[in-house]
Curated annotation (Swiss-Prot):
Biological function: Involved in the recruitment or surface expression of the TYROBP receptor.
CDD domains documented for this protein: IgV_CD200R-like
Record GO biological process: regulation of neuroinflammatory response
PANTHER family: CELL SURFACE GLYCOPROTEIN CD200 RECEPTOR 2, CELL SURFACE GLYCOPROTEIN OX2 RECEPTOR PRECURSOR
Source organism: Mus musculus (Mouse)
One MF annotation (Gene Ontology) recorded for this entry: signaling receptor activity
Cytoplasmic compartment spans: 263-270
One cellular-component annotation, GO: external side of plasma membrane
Residues annotated as transmembrane: 242-262
Start and end residues of each Ig-like C2-type domain: 134-229
Predominant location category: membrane
The protein, known as: Cell surface glycoprotein CD200 receptor 4
Length: 270
């Protein structure tokens, strides 16, 4: 009977913690699981942070729980796993995450929050906070995803074309044009998980002189204006005009040459 009474208490504490801590920590796409057989309550959270920004990962508020041991288990995608733990009874702090810019946000006996001072691609992975209490264990799992803003470049091409490129973004950026043109977009994936997107567009209409490239990304959007190179279109009428001009120039040249020839001949006779 006592074991059954533990679970509702833990569930209530979790609900209060999510509501209160939402003002200081970013919680996205949370799911709560309650395992009555093992007295384990788990919260899963997906978190996206821009590269070079500070990340704050919340656990359960220790003042609300009679915690004994707080442990962060960190599993990076491209680095060995490491742990950061604090024993509240012994007041001891242990870590195997040295050199990764991952520390307690404050003193763990007051707040078990974890912070990453400057997020990098190597910090992607899962961060699990485990709190051991006499009433049961609490577990909060973060899936940390790093966002990388792309480097945007653009330039006009030949024959009324323009190129817009979003280099090394994560996730891949999306490129659109105004007005619409005849576009070809290609993507190139890199070994670090970033993607370069390159879009080349062509406009046949002579009345289009300036176009806009919109680069959409999770870290922010950029809109750029490009002035098209004023390449002339070779229509049949323009080809005929060019031909007539060339023929007229040729006739003039021949007349001048002939006139000079006869003048020289007449001069030689005299």
């Amino acid at each position: 009977m006592h074991a059954l009474g533990r679970i509702p208490t833990l569930t209530l504490l979790i609900f209060i913690n999510i509501f209160v801590s939402g003002s200081s920590c970013t919680d996205e796409n949370q799911t709560i699981q309650n395992d009555s057989s093992s007295s384990l309550t788990q919260v899963n959270t997906t978190m996206s942070v821009q590269m070079d920004k500070k990340a704050l990962l919340c656990c359960f508020s220790s003042p609300l729980i009679n915690a004994v041991l707080i442990t962060w288990i960190i599993k990076h995608r491209h680095l060995p796993s490491c742990t950061i733990a604090y024993n509240l009874d012994k007041k001891t702090n242990e870590t195997s995450c040295l050199g990764r810019n991952i520390t307690w946000a404050s003193t763990p006996d007051h707040s078990p929050e974890l912070q990453i001072s400057a997020v990098a691609l190597q910090h992607e992975g899962t961060y699990t906070c485990e709190i051991v209490t006499p009433e049961g264990n609490l577990e909060k799992v973060y899936d940390l995803q790093v966002l990388v803003p792309p480097e945007v470049t653009y330039f006009p091409g030949k024959n009324r074309t323009a190129v817009c490129e979003a280099m090394a973004g994560k996730p891949a950026a999306q490129i659109s044009w105004t007005p619409d043109g005849d576009c070809v977009t290609k993507s190139e994936s890199h070994s670090n998980g970033t993607v370069t997107v390159r879009s080349t567009c062509h406009w046949e209409q002579n009345n289009v002189s300036v176009v806009s490239c919109l680069v959409s990304h999770s870290t922010g959007n950029q809109s750029l204006s490009i002035e098209l190179s004023q390449g002339t279109m070779t229509t049949p009428r323009s080809l005929l005009t060019i031909l007539y001009v060339k023929m007229a120039l040729l006739v003039i040249i021949l007349l001048n040459v002939g006139f000079a020839f006869f003048q020289k001949r007449n001069f030689a006779r005299t």
